[in-house]
């Protein structure tokens, strides 16, 4: 009988090299088809075994809580670890075909026939992100079906696919932000090789692929790390999602940094978007964000690391060495401008041409000003002068800003927003890095609602938790808020691809193609230097001017209700009169309500 291990035992020195595949936990196929090495770390179990294809085998202790066994089985073998007689899923599993509570499958990453050897990544300045939820992007909701849409995205003019989280989570549907087994791609979307095929196909078309990862919490069902060692977690801090991940524990750091490397190395993703980085709490000497950036940039090639962070901290780039930041202020000022809405966190924004001009010029709205919203009272943000324009990721819609509304309605479906205003939204012509959400380019009629698949008390708790989280928005108290656990809520959110070629959908799609073509081909707009940009306003007309050695471009967006002639707009410079684009497709220099033009 194996003796009880001390709390948080230290693995042998040979297991401190994170990059060495010979020290990986989980199931690792051996070279030449010689079998599979099964390995785990536990601080609590007295007896340890592995059950492979129904047969149980006692594992050998290597000291320091490490157990190992090599068996003559290959890819496709199913297994569970057995801790003190209890069958326990592997939190390092590379695939969980039957879900997060089931057996893992041995996966050999080396058998996929990659064809992207000539792909060397994408620079952030060249990125036009297109956010995709695999389950609702196509009727089938699979990796293979998503791959069939890649030629359309290439023709549209986007350059990088931003995939919502894929780490395995409980249930048959969900957004992905309740991942429980970080190393296993979500099985209902397809097998690991299907995901590899999606990335490979994108690279063949010249499209980058980025993955959204969640390293601030685990989902409420299906995470078994604490069964192996409670020290993965801590009560020194917590979040709305539960106990904190203890990044002072070397195995937790290794779990996350190794996971990041896996997505980039084994699946060929071009970069990662880190969800909610304010909640990646770490009191270690080197913050986990800094270590992640170092790990990713040392992989070779062009790999990018982006943060979703509302704090407006340039240090994320200048100190932690991340590459870019999903910022909220541009979206929030745009939404308040178009809708007049000032509930919840929108209360901190005033909207209008002047506010948008300031936000675009400075990168974000808050750079040290006082923030007093939702019970918070503090200075927010710091000046962003050290950042380049591409460091800011701008959007007018994303999964949160649509899905966290009571009915999951899109911006153009909001009260008071006309299609003229929606089409006039200017993010694609700014030097910041733009992001579109699936279907945005044709003003999709389908919502994107919050959905999950948790039964019983857990499902009820998730639903009630959302109402509490967004209690500052009056719509969440209504009886018409969709039930997140109902399958129909998920089905409602699937894109209707048939509508995009008709009526106003087709008209909007043509505009997005034209905007992205200009962004790509225009010699002035293609220059992303922030110092070339000036902004201002004349009443309700926002102007954004870009001047480079290649010429001058001026964007004018009428945010008022009165029609304005471009010649009548008072500007501190002479306005060029050559029309390059009118958001309503006209050939005149007149701005109706919500309309925009680009001149140069």
Curated annotation (Swiss-Prot):
Name assigned to this protein: Malto-oligosyltrehalose trehalohydrolase
Molecular function, one GO term: 4-alpha-D-(1->4)-alpha-D-glucanotrehalose trehalohydrolase activity
Keyword Cytoplasm on entry: yes
Organism: Deinococcus radiodurans (strain ATCC 13939 / DSM 20539 / JCM 16871 / CCUG 27074 / LMG 4051 / NBRC 15346 / NCIMB 9279 / VKM B-1422 / R1)
Pfam families attached to this UniProt entry: Alpha-amylase, CBM_48, DUF3459
Gene3D superfamilies listed in its UniProt record: E-set domains of sugar-utilizing enzymes, Glycosidases, Golgi alpha-mannosidase II, Immunoglobulins
InterPro entries xrefs: DUF3459, Glyco_hydro_13_cat_dom, Glyco_hydro_13_N, Glyco_hydro_b, Glycoside_hydrolase_SF, Ig-like_fold, Ig_E-set, Trehalose_TreZ
Localization annotation: Cytoplasm
């Amino acid at each position: 009988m194996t003796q009880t291990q001390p709390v948080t035992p230290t693995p042998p020195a040979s297991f401190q090299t994170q990059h060495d595949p010979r020290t990986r936990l989980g199931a690792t196929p051996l070279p030449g088809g010689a079998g599979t090495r099964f390995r785990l770390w536990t601080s609590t179990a007295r007896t340890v075994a592995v059950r492979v294809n129904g047969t149980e085998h006692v594992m050998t202790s290597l000291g320091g809580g490490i157990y190992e066994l090599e068996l003559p089985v290959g890819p496709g073998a199913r297994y569970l670890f057995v801790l003190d007689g209890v069958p326990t899923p592997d939190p390092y599993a590379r695939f969980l075909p039957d879900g997060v509570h089931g057996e893992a499958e041995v996966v050999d990453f080396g058998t996929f026939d990659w064809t992207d050897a000539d792909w060397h990544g994408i620079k952030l300045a060249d990125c036009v992100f297109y956010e995709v939820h695999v389950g609702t992007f196509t009727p089938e909701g699979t990796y293979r079906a998503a791959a069939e849409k890649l030629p359309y995205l290439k023709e549209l003019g986007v350059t990088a696919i931003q995939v919502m989280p894929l780490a395995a989570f409980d249930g048959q549907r969900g957004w992905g932000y309740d991942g429980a087994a970080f190393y296993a791609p979500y099985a209902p979307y397809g097998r690991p090789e299907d995901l590899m095929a999606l990335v490979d196909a994108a690279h063949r078309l010249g499209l980058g692929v980025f993955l959204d990862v969640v390293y601030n919490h685990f989902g409420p069902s299906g995470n078994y790390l604490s069964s192996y060692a409670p020290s993965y977690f801590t009560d020194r801090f917590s979040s709305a999602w539960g106990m904190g991940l203890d990044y002072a524990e070397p195995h937790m750091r290794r779990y996350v940094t190794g996971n990041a490397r896996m997505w980039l190395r084994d699946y060929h993703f071009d970069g990662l978007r880190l969800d909610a980085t304010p909640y990646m709490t770490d009191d270690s000497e080197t913050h986990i964000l800094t270590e992640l950036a170092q790990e990713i940039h040392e992989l070779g090639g062009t790999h990018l690391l982006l943060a979703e962070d509302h704090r407006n901290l340039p240090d994320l780039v200048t100190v932690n060495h991340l590459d870019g930041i999903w910022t909220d202020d541009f979206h929030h000022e745009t939404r308040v401008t178009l809708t007049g809405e000032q509930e919840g966190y929108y209360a901190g924004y005033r909207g209008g041409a002047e506010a948008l001009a300031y936000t675009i010029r400075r990168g974000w709205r808050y750079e040290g000003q006082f923030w007093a919203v939702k019970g918070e009272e503090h200075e927010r943000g710091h000046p962003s002068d050290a950042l380049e324009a591409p460091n800011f990721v701008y959007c007018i819609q994303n999964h949160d800003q649509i899905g966290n509304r009571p009915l999951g309605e899109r911006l153009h479906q909001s009260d008071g927003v006309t299609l003229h205003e929606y089409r006039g939204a200017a993010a694609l012509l700014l030097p910041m890095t733009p992001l579109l959400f699936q279907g945005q380019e044709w003003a999709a009629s389908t919502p994107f609602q919050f959905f999950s698949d948790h039964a019983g008390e857990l499902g009820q708790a998730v639903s009630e938790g959302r109402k509490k989280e967004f209690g500052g928005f009056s719509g969440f108290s209504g009886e018409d808020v969709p039930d997140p656990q109902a399958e129909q809520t998920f089905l409602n959110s699937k894109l209707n691809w048939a509508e995009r070629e008709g009526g106003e959908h087709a008209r909007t799609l043509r505009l997005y193609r034209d905007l992205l073509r200009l962004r790509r081909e225009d010699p002035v707009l293609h220059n992303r230097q922030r110092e070339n940009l000036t902004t201002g306003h004349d009443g309700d007309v926002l102007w954004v001017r870009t001047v480079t050695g290649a010429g001058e471009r001026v964007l004018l967006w009428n945010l008022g209700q009165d029609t304005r002639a471009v010649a009548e707009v008072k500007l501190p410079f002479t306005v060029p009169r050559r029309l390059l684009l009118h958001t309503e497709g006209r050939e005149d220099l007149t701005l109706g309500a919500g309309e925009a033009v680009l001149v140069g």
